[in-house]
Amino acid sequence: MSNQHALLMFNLLPVGSNISTWWNFGSMLLTCLMLQTITGFFLALHYTANINLAFSSVIHITRDVPYGWIMQNLHAISASLFFVCIYIHIARGLYYGLYLNKEVWLSGTALLITLMATAFFGYVLPWGQMSFWAATVITNLLTAIPYLGTTLTTWLWGGFSINDPTITRFFALHFILPFIIISLSSIHIILLHNEGSNNPLGTNSDIDKIPFHPYHSYKDMLMATTMITLLFLILSFAPNLLNDPENFSKANPLVTPQHIKPEWYFLFAYGILRSIPNKLGGTLALIMSVMILTTMPFTHTSHTRSMMFRPLSQILFWTLIATFITITWTASKPVEPPFITISQTTSIIYFFFFITTPLLGWAENKMMMMNN
């Protein structure tokens, strides 16, 4: 009887003994989701989805509701930590070749898209100046769709401009989407446990498995505690660290901010959108910046699953990480030289990773065969 079968017999979840800290971000994401759902529920009790009252209701929550400022800041800061964790989680998947478990990877990509939609709708709700203008710019991209664009935009807005029906439906969507995220997360976890977790070596773990509890459960608890400590440190000492100063002013359709930008976690996609001077081209590039992740399971050519023993692929991977950070930085700057050139160059390098990875896989296979 194998180690795995013995563990399953006693109802102990068998997990590879050598999975590293990078495998802890899934449980940290679950912690973030729980925090977001609880704080979001209490905020929804006091929030008013009306263009004349939304901004005032957020001020009322932070000033008058007991512990309202904690709920509001926890909700905003843990949204940022949610995206930090999910980007690390995706990067881990790319590095260790976890995308070869197709069902898990594709359900994870669907989760990412749903999460991004939820965060976008939530950013609009406080009805600050940047909320309003970010919503105007992003929803306006729908008009780039041939034939259907204008109809879709009018349908989403609930009129011919962003108005009261828009904020009502955005609130409804922001409320319902987390429950869809919970459902998708359950599917994601079920699909993962269908095959089991991979490990840093990219080899089969069946011969060397240990019970999830206590070994990995305590490791998960340690990382979740570290994240919550960081969350409360930001909450206590710099609660507005990740907020945009423009959002402290009420939305005014007659005054355009000097530089319209979404929250930091969307800046990489916004930077790619902004680097293309054509509306339809920019919109397609924005969609592809996330959707290109779905191509990874189908373009893997290397005989080795993980990048751990592939130095050339490692260089390419860390170039992608540096590119991601650079696009985020340039997108937070005004549209002027040298930021335009940097943004366009880094956008090309970003997509270059997904095109070059399969070619490099073939090259590495040839090199391995030559060495043998």
From Swiss-Prot:
Residues annotated as binding heme b b562 are: H75, H174
Keyword list, A-Z: Electron transport, Heme, Iron, Membrane, Metal-binding, Mitochondrion, Mitochondrion inner membrane, Respiratory chain, Transmembrane, Transmembrane helix, Transport, Ubiquinone
Asked if the keyword DNA damage belongs to this entry, the reply reads no
Give residues annotated as binding heme b b566: H89, H188
Q: How is the cofactor bound?
A: Binds 2 heme b groups non-covalently.
Q: Tell me where in or outside the cell this protein is found.
A: Mitochondrion inner membrane
Matching Pfam families, A to Z? Cytochrom_B_C (PF00032), Cytochrome_B (PF00033)
The yes or no answer to whether the keyword Transmembrane is present is yes
Where do transmembrane segments lie in this chain?
25-45, 69-90, 105-125, 170-190, 218-238, 280-300, 312-332, 339-358
Q: How does it sit in the membrane?
A: Multi-pass membrane protein
Q: Give the GO molecular function terms.
A: metal ion binding; ubiquinol-cytochrome-c reductase activity
Q: Which proteins does it associate with, and in what oligomeric form?
A: The cytochrome bc1 complex contains 3 respiratory subunits (MT-CYB, CYC1 and UQCRFS1), 2 core proteins (UQCRC1 and UQCRC2) and probably 6 low-molecular weight proteins.
Q: What is this protein called?
A: Cytochrome b
The protein's organism comes out as Naja nivea (Cape cobra)
